[in-house]
Amino acid sequence: MSVRADLHTHSAASDGQYAPAALVEKAAGAGLQVLALTDHDTMSGTEEAIRAGKRWGVEVLRGVELGAAEDRHLHILGLGFGPRYPALESLCETLRASRDERKYRIVEFLEEKGVRISLEEVEQQGGGQVIARPHFAQVMLRHGYVASLREAFDRYLDTDEYQRIERYKASAAECVAAIHADGGKAVLAHPYQLGLPEEELDRMTAALRGAGLDGIECFYPRHTPEQTAFYLELARKYDLRVTGGSDFHGEQVKPDISLTGWELELAWLCCR
């Protein structure tokens, strides 16, 4: 039986706008039955979200989004792991430490571009959670360096030059292994972002399947109908589960993305 679900969302525990409980309340208002909280490199908001889900009648799945080393746009979602997740926590601790070190170099990078903002203000924007690009973008907007969050990314935070500010990332195989070690399922997120021709994406999907990938995010707000059809074909070809997610961060962070939801069959997620 299918349920209306959104399996890719972010809260203020990483770079989203809403506290986990507030995110779940919005999901209930949007008519969602199942929500996965997939913050970047952290599960710190999960238990708050689960408690809110019981209050609002939304089933909340534990989740996480991990960036893989092979490509800056290769992201792996971990879904449906249990209340104990030592392998993922160990990996995420390493990833967060690398993010924490990189924030100093981001400030230096922006200063070289004439953007002078304080790290203290960025950390306040982050609310003590994982510091990520949207936090820098919000501060830049506040001080008038950009006219919109989109401009902050286009001019500064999503350029090839910015991407040379390195941080540690695990390989896709390591991400999948950590997710499996804690009883979860590994899903390729927003494949369109990889920007690969179909043949290359087919080869990458085959390699990821060989590493244990369980599913592919076929449904995503920025996928075209043609892309969605191709991803569904990849799922059939490689016996991958089909998921869908909005990648919702909040109206202030990604104004064009709302909590959506797709009719999905989720019996394969063991911790439902």
Label every PLM stretch briefly.
Residues 82, 93-104, 130:
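Short, amphipathic alpha-helical segments
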Residues 97-124:
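Conserved phosphoryl-transfer catalytic core
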Residues 126-193:
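Conserved acidic, metal-coordinating active-site core of Asp-based
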Residues 1-11, 17-30, 44-66, 70-84, ...:
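Charged catalytic cores and adjacent phosphate/nucleic-acid-binding surfaces used
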Residues 33-35:
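Short active-site oxyanion
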Residues 89-98, 123-126, 162-163:
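Flexible, glycine/proline-enriched loop segments at strand-loop-helix junctions
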